[in-house]
Structures are given as C-alpha cells and as structure tokens.
Regions:
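A surface-exposed beta-strand-loop module
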Residues: 23-84
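Aromatic/His-enriched, Gly/Pro-containing loop or helix-boundary segments
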Residues: 37-58, 93-102, 236-245
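N-terminal, polar/Ser/Thr-rich
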Residues: 1, 32, 79, 85-91, ...
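A short, structured loop/turn motif at beta-sheet edges
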Residues: 12-14, 56-62, 125-126, 140-143
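Early extracytoplasmic/domain-onset interaction patches
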Residues: 1-13
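Aromatic-lined ligand-binding clefts that engage carbohydrates, nucleic acids, or primary amines
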Residues: 15-24
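Hydrophobic beta-strand positions in extracellular immunoglobulin-like domains
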Residues: 6-8, 67, 104, 121
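Hydrophobic helix-coil surface modules that form long, contiguous segments used
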Residues: 2, 95-99, 107-245
Length: 245
C-alpha cells in the first residue's frame, strides 16, 4: 500500500493522461494540491494489463495515485525464509523487465519514457531495503525507513527494489557487495576486483557515469544470470565460484 506522485509538464494541454496498470487496486487519484479527480481503468489484457485514464487540466503539474499491489503481481517476488540462504527472514525482490513495473507502480511503462525518481520505503527494522538508485544504506536502521534518489533518466523497467536480511561490504571507493550474511564473505572475495575492472574500462572508454556500482547477490530463485539495474546489479548466486572467474 502506498502512492506514486508523477510530476508532469502538460505541454499539449491535454485533459487525459494515460498510465499503465496491471492488476493494481487503485484507491484514489488527486491532482496538484490534493484535488480529487476522476479515473477510468480500461479493458484488461493478459500481457499489457489495462490503460488507466486520468482526468487532468492543462495547468496540472502533478498526478498522485494511491494504490495497493496484489499477491499475484508478476514483478514482485516474495520468498519465504526457507527459500533464502539464511533461512531466517523473508525476502522480496522486483523484476520489471520487460513490462512488469506496471504490476507494482502505476506508470507509463515503456522504454521510450525516461524518468527520474525519489522514493521512500518503510520496512520491518530487521530487514534492509535497497533500490537501484543513490543513497542505498550500508546497514539496517532501527526505524526501517529508507530514502532513495535516481537523478539520471531511466526507463521504468529499471526501477528495482530488494528487501531482506542483507549486509554490505565495500570492495572499493565506489563499489561494494550486498548479500545474505552467510554469503557475504564469499561474495566479497568473488567481486573484490570490480573496482579495478572499472578503472581499466575507464582508461579505454572514459569515466563511469553512474556514480556507484554495487552488486546485490540474490537468492537462488532469481531467474536471471543478472539484471543490469543502474547502480545496483542484481546477480545470481551461481556466479560465486570461489575463483573470481
């Protein structure tokens, strides 16, 4: 349960703005200074979900959508404790590619649309929350509240989230590894040379443009070899071989 606020520039003066949604429960939509507005959710398609048409004004500057996700959201992967390496705490990770971000955020879910964002998350205090963005924490806090910023325009499928019993170990000034405590030592050894790899690449192709480059080692149920989420690659634990290959 939460909300998303879209800051917009209504260049054409349209009175209808269309968002992509897929099996989301929409509570209400408001414009600018909390002004309620009408919305209509169109016909459902198994792949694309539904168009959500929101009534706006030519002068509208923001559209805020209050909503909740569903247990069957295709982008949200919920794992029970026994499905994790540590076996003690549940785990959540998202996978937005190709058009699944609309199953957890009402948005214009196409690669043509590049967005920046700020996000605030509230999670249980015994878990750590990460996003593919700036300001990722390196340790849990007692409030379980975290804030993030992505100031480089990205397609919506690269909005990524992970929540679990995670710890961090730096591998360089701008690189590090997040993993379950039982995997952290092995993961840190495996990726210890990432900072040097970046430096070599920069000597050939120019400066790395994204600030930090961290790696999150996910549970074995992660269905990809890796996902190129900006600033925080999501990686399968099967690449931890012990020989840095």
């Amino acid at each position: 349960i939460g909300f998303v606020k879209h800051d917009i520039e209504n260049i054409t003066g349209t009175t209808t703005m269309i968002f992509d949604v897929n099996q989301l429960s929409i509570d209400k939509v408001v414009l600018d200074d909390n002004e309620p507005t009408q919305f209509v959710i169109g016909n459902y398609d198994d792949v694309k979900g539904s168009p959500m048409e929101v009534t706006v004004k030519p002068e509208t500057k923001s559209v805020t959508i209050y909503y909740s996700t569903q247990p069957n959201s295709k982008a949200l992967q919920w794992l029970a404790p026994q499905q994790t390496a540590g076996k003690k705490f549940p785990y959540l990770f998202t996978q937005g590619e190709a058009v699944l971000t609309r199953t957890w955020i009402p948005c214009q879910d196409t690669p043509q649309n590049r967005i920046t964002y700020d996000a605030t998350l509230q999670v249980p205090s015994n878990l750590l929350a990460l996003m593919a963005a700036d300001n990722n924490p390196t340790e849990k806090n007692t409030e379980g509240k975290y804030a993030y910023t992505m100031d480089i325009p990205i397609p919506t499928y690269l909005i990524a989230l992970a929540v679990g019993d995670l710890e961090f170990q730096a591998t360089g000034e701008r690189t590090g590894v997040y993993a379950s405590p039982v995997l952290l030592e092995a993961a840190t050894y495996e990726f210890a040379e990432v900072e040097e790899m970046i430096k070599v690449t920069e000597s050939l192709y120019g400066d790395y443009q994204w600030g930090r480059y961290d790696i999150l080692v996910l549970p074995t149920s992660f269905p990809y070899g890796g996902m190129e989420n900006p600033k925080l690659t999501f990686a399968t634990p099967t690449i931890i071989t012990g020989d840095r290959s």
